[in-house]
Amino acid sequence: VHAVCPGDGEIGVFNRSHYEEVLVVRAKGLVPESVWKKRYRHVNEFERMLSDEGTKIIKCLLNVSKAEQARRFQDRLDDPTKNWKFRAGDLADRKLWPKFQDAYDDMVRNTSTSYAPWHVVPSDHNWVRNLAVAKLLLNALKEMNPKFPPPEPGIEGTKIA
C-alpha cells in the first residue's frame, strides 16, 4: 500500500487495501490470531505516519445488510450484464457472514483513531451511501482548503504556436 499512497496535492482511493490483512485472513482462518491481531498496531502506525506527513485519511466502511447482499448477488446472477461481478467464492464467503461481521467490528474498534477515524456508512441504498461519502469528502476538502500549485517558473506568458 505504501508504494501507491498519494503524494503532495494528490488524492488516492483504496478499496480495502491493508485491511484485508485483518479481515479476510481472520474470517477465513488463513493465519493464526497472534498474526492478524498485531496487524491492528501495524495499520495504526502506518496511518499515524501518513497523518504526521500531512495526509488526510478518510476511512469509510460501506455497511451492507445480509438481506441486501443476497439481493445484489441474485441480481448479478440474473442479469447477464452483471454476471462479471459475481464469483463462486462469494457464496463461500457469505457462509462466513458472522465471522466477517466480528472481524469488521474489531477492525473498526481497533483502528479508528483521532487521526484516521472510521465512518460506518449505511449502504443498502446507493444514493444514501453516495451522499454520505460525498459529504465526508466535501467537508474534508473544505477543511483542507486546497490551492492550485504555482506555475513552473519561466512559463508565464508562453504562447503555443
Descriptions of predicted regions:
Residues 1-44:
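Conserved nucleotide-sensing/catalytic segment adjacent to the nucleotide-binding pocket
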Residues 18-20, 64-67, 125-127:
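Short, solvent-exposed loop/turn segments at secondary-structure junctions
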Residues 24-42, 50-102, 149-156:
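A glycine- and Lys/Arg-enriched "phosphate-lid" helix/loop adjacent to the NTP-binding pocket
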Residues 100-161:
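NTP-dependent small-molecule kinase module
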